[in-house]
């Protein structure tokens, strides 16, 4: 236990929290340009072809972003918005593409959970 004099001379340092999304620089989203759009396979025991994009952000970071939903229109040089949120079975993928923003189209076949995929309300 430190004495009062020791604490006056050198106060206690606050614990530094490590962020899970360093490329966002404490921003909610970031804009970037796709440098490569490809599919990759998940870790065991899952099996699929997950759609991901390599993105060069406006702050200079280059990150891998997951493209959620069925089908997408992204290609190289597409301008997209990314948000935080990792994909548990894809190592190194810590970001998600925001559907329905900038060059990334929404999923037009969505009926439920539409807001997460940038889908408009159907005409019923």
From Swiss-Prot:
Keyword tRNA-binding part of the UniProt annotation: yes
PROSITE patterns xref list:
RIBOSOMAL_S12
Q: Kindly list the positions at which 3-methylthioaspartic acid occurs in this protein.
A: 89
Q: Subunit structure of this entry?
A: Part of the 30S ribosomal subunit. Contacts proteins S8 and S17. May interact with IF1 in the 30S initiation complex.
Disulfide bridge map = none
Q: Which family does it belong to?
A: Belongs to the universal ribosomal protein uS12 family.
**What does the UniProt keyword field contain?**
Methylation, Ribonucleoprotein, Ribosomal protein, RNA-binding, rRNA-binding, tRNA-binding
PANTHER family on file? 30S RIBOSOMAL PROTEIN S12 FAMILY MEMBER
Q: Which organism is it from?
A: Shewanella denitrificans (strain OS217 / ATCC BAA-1090 / DSM 15013)
Concerning HAMAP family, the annotation shows: Ribosomal_uS12_B
Q: Does the keyword rRNA-binding apply?
A: yes
Extract the InterPro entries matched here: NA-bd_OB-fold, Ribosomal_uS12, Ribosomal_uS12_bac
Superkingdom: Bacteria
- GO BP annotations listed: translation
Q: Please provide one cellular component term from the Gene Ontology annotations of this protein.
A: small ribosomal subunit
Tell me, what does this protein do in biology?
Answer: With S4 and S5 plays an important role in translational accuracy. Interacts with and stabilizes bases of the 16S rRNA that are involved in tRNA selection in the A site and with the mRNA backbone. Located at the interface of the 30S and 50S subunits, it traverses the body of the 30S subunit contacting proteins on the other side and probably holding the rRNA structure together. The combined cluster of proteins S8, S12 and S17 appears to hold together the shoulder and platform of the 30S subunit.
Protein name as catalogued: Small ribosomal subunit protein uS12
